[in-house]
Design a protein with these regions (language model features):
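N-terminal beta1-alpha1 ligand-phosphate binding loop
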Residues: 1-37, 166-167
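Hydrophobic/aromatic beta-strand patches that form the interior of the parallel beta-sheet core
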Residues: 4-6, 32-34, 61, 102-104, ...
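Flexible, glycine-rich phosphate/dinucleotide-binding loops
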Residues: 12-13, 40-42, 110, 154
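Generic recognition of short, well-ordered alpha-helical segments
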Residues: 16-20, 45, 73-77, 157
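Glycine-rich phosphate/pyrophosphate-binding loop and the adjoining helix
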Residues: 22-26, 128-175
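N-terminal beta-loop-helix "entrance" segment that forms/cooperates
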Residues: 31-54
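Helix-loop-strand module that forms the ligand-binding subsite of alpha/beta enzymes
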Residues: 48-132
Length: 175
């Protein structure tokens, strides 16, 4: 199983969880980690390069901290530019058909806030629905996300454990 992780954090150097995840995932031969803000500091995305990379992998993982109930802006821009009509969707757009899409998400708040009646009023599953809809449109299989809740309450041990669990999770077969 070849896995491409697109790590999207605008301040990766000062990140706690996402940085630890990148460091752990980079140790695995079948996982390629690309930090999009580092790759494109000017946000000028090389669409052809990104499409070619996506075609080489079985599973694509979007890794990001939840920002305002969504992803950081560069991931949205990446989707807008890379997942084009005729390549990712439409009658001729089948480049990603049969591949898998997974999310690896960190949140500042604890899990209890992400449910009906919780502080955020919606479950993480509801908040991530646009990614599932995108996956459906482009013919990918949407896999259950890996979520690390409560970053602001986590200690170093929690973070190290989460990184190892993520590495195991994104490599496991789901079908």
């Amino acid at each position: 199983l070849k896995v491409l992780v697109l790590a999207v954090h605008p301040q990766m150097d000062t990140s706690v969880v996402n940085k630890a995840w990148v460091e752990e995932l980079s140790k695995h031969d079948n996982i390629t980690v690309r930090e999009l803000y580092k790759e494109y500091p000017d946000e000028a995305i090389d669409v052809a390069k990104e499409q070619q990379l996506c075609e080489q992998y079985d599973r694509i993982v979007f890794q990001f901290p939840l920002y305002w109930y969504s992803s950081p802006p560069l991931l949205k821009k990446w989707q807008d530019l890379v997942l084009t009509y005729g390549w990712a969707f439409g009658s001729e757009g089948k480049a990603l058909h049969g591949k898998e899409l997974m999310l690896a998400v960190s949140t500042g708040s604890e899990a209890e806030k992400y449910q009906a009646g919780g502080g955020n009023h919606y479950s993480i599953s509801e908040l991530l629905k646009p990614f599932q809809a995108t996956s459906n449109l482009i013919g990918m299989t949407y896999l259950p996300p890996y979520v690390f809740y409560g970053v602001k309450y986590a200690n170093a041990e929690d973070i190290a454990i989460s990184a190892k669990r993520l590495a195991d999770y994104i490599q496991k077969p789901f079908s």
